[in-house]
Regions:
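Helical element adjacent to the flavin cofactor pocket in flavoenzyme catalytic cores
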Residues: 143-186, 190-208, 212-215
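Beta1/beta-strand and adjacent pyrophosphate-binding region of the FAD-binding site
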Residues: 8-20
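Helix-loop-beta segment of a Rossmann-like dinucleotide-binding subdomain
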Residues: 62-63, 91-102, 124-167, 275-279, ...
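C-terminal catalytic lobe of FAD-dependent flavoproteins
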Residues: 153, 308-380
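Dinucleotide-binding Rossmann-like beta1-alpha1 core, especially the glycine-rich loop
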Residues: 54-133, 139, 297
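Active-site lid/adjacent beta-loop-alpha segment flanking the redox-cofactor pocket in flavoenzymes
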Residues: 50, 248-334
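Glycine-rich FAD pyrophosphate-binding loop
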Residues: 31-50
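Central helical "cap/lid" subdomain
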Residues: 207-256, 284-287, 304
Length: 380
């Protein structure tokens, strides 16, 4: 890791501020494009990429507008993106385009769903065909065969980290970024007045504090992003989850119910999520109320799973914005880029976020309009 001395002009690596899924995806893409990248991460284990269920569900989640477009673009790119990660890492990522079923209490609710036109309509018999043992409350449904899942918790994160190493990305784990150092810009270049990123202040795992010069960095700090950039509209939404061990093949589709979803892995593990607790802030730990909510969701969606043995219980923090869409592209400081605020769609949007932000950093103009829709200035 570089010390406080400046590197040769033009050789400074791009600093990735955050080692979660989005940060790793971006570091890998930049390295593929020939740029040096260094990932600064306090504790990668706390990243949302390790605790999410891994759904790829732009249609099942009922997204709309530009966020739906962003999700669809990413979904299209994910097979090739995963193939590159698997090639660079030698590890499988657990991608399954297995389809997602959204159950409803009535056909009217089904037909009013924002993305109903993208799915196959199911009646009660169709629900029973797709989800063996589905609870009696549900009378209609939508099947989105184009949606799916990836095993982020056990496979994708490890594979992506190894792929980054393969591409020469450097890592500094246990490194806390304390602040950004800026300098005036525009005085000599004729650019509009403003601030230019000059360095980051950080504390390494051994306690050493230093100032690391840099001209470009990407803020991928997830729910903690506003701690580095006060005023950035990103806040934590706590989520609790659990997993059960079911029989292999007992459930082939993801089930996306109201307040609860069931994500079956190939080995029979059933990932159950998730509470949504914006009032919890960064409060850690499981709660009886949260676990009761998950259990009630299992009882309603798939009663047969109530007897399956529990495996894990965990929690994490989604990085949310007030419109529940990410912040992508140029930041409010020259040289600082944003890739954060993905809320519950970080796994889905990792591929397109890395592509768009890396492309913009390299001066590529493709999809500039889509990137602009997620610029931070929409909150200004």
């Amino acid at each position: 890791m570089p010390t406080g001395t400046s590197a040769e002009p033009g050789t400074d690596p791009v600093l990735i501020l955050g080692g979660g899924l989005i940060g790793l995806a971006l570091a890998h893409e930049l390295a593929r494009q020939g740029l040096a990248a260094t990932v600064l991460s306090r504790r990668r284990s706390e990243a949302a990429g390790f605790v999410a269920a891994g759904m790829l569900a732009p249609h099942a989640e009922g997204l709309d507008g530009r966020l739906l477009e962003l999700g669809q673009r990413s979904l299209e790119r994910i097979p090739a993106w995963v193939a590159r990660i698997e090639s660079d890492s030698g590890l499988a990522c657990g991608l399954r385009i297995c389809g997602i079923v959204v159950p409803f209490a009535s056909a009217a609710e089904r037909d009013a769903y924002p993305t109903a036109a993208h799915g196959e309509r199911l009646d009660r018999s169709g629900l029973e065909r797709e989800i063996t043992g589905i609870g009696p409350l549900w009378r209609a449904g939508l099947l989105f065969p184009q949606d799916g899942q990836i095993d982020n918790r056990r496979r994708l994160m490890r594979a992506l980290e190894r792929a980054c190493v393969h591409r020469g990305v450097r890592f500094e784990e246990g490194c806390e970024v304390l602040g950004l150092v800026t300098e005036p810009q525009g005085q000599q270049t004729g650019e509009a007045p403003g601030e230019q990123l000059a360095a980051v202040r950080l504390r390494r795992a051994d306690g050493q504090e230093l100032t690391l010069p840099c001209r470009e960095a990407v803020l991928c700090g997830g729910a903690w992003s506003s701690q580095l950039l006060p005023g950035l509209p990103v806040f934590p939404v706590k989520g609790q989850m659990l997993s059960l061990q079911g029989p292999i093949g007992a459930l082939s589709r993801v089930v996306f119910g109201p307040g609860t979803y069931l994500v079956p892995r190939e080995d029979g593990l059933l990932v159950v999520g998730a509470t949504s607790e914006p009032e919890a802030g960064f409060g850690e730990g499981l709660t009886p109320a949260g676990q009761r909510q998950l259990q009630a969701g299992i009882d309603a969606l798939l009663p047969t799973a109530t007897g399956w043995p529990p495996m894990e219980r965990w929690w994490g923090f989604r990085p949310c914005t007030t419109d529940q869409a990410p912040l992508l592209g140029k930041g409010p400081i020259g040289g600082l880029w944003l890739a954060t605020g993905h809320h519950r769609n970080g796994v889905l949007l990792a591929a397109i976020s890395a592509e768009l932000v890396a492309g913009a950093m390299l001066g590529q103009q493709s999809d500039a309009g889509l990137l602009e829709a997620f610029h931070w200035s929409r909150f200004a």
